[in-house]
Amino acid sequence: MRHKHGYRKLGRTSSHRKALLKNLAIALIEHNKIETGIYKAKELRSYIEKLTTVARVGDFNAHRHVFAYLQNKEATHKLVTEIAPKYAQRNGGYTRIQRTTFRIGDASTLATIEFV
């Protein structure tokens, strides 16, 4: 039984899931808005909001913490210096998820996730 399980497995191994969330987070930081499956978007929201909360501090340790998750210098720099300072007075809720359409091939629900 999977009652009260803390996260979605997304049909992937733990390493594949970790790489997927990292790549989606980098894409969201670079483009400010991406379209993906609804459940991937919901998992990404949790992942990116935790990173944004840490990045709001803006010091050297925040850079290190964010880089440890993203492993991408440009995305880390953009998150800590450009995106996170916008949310200095906001307590969570940095992203918005909107259902958009259904994918043609398998009719799965798609959604856009963007920074507010």
Swiss-Prot record:
GO terms for cellular component: cytosolic large ribosomal subunit. PROSITE patterns: RIBOSOMAL_L17. Pfam families: Ribosomal_L17. Keywords: Ribonucleoprotein, Ribosomal protein. GO terms for molecular function: structural constituent of ribosome. Signal peptide: none annotated. The keyword Ribonucleoprotein applies. One of its GO terms (biological process) is translation. Belongs to the bacterial ribosomal protein bL17 family. Part of the 50S ribosomal subunit. Contacts protein L32. NCBIfam families: L17 (TIGR00059). This is Large ribosomal subunit protein bL17. It comes from Helicobacter acinonychis (strain Sheeba).
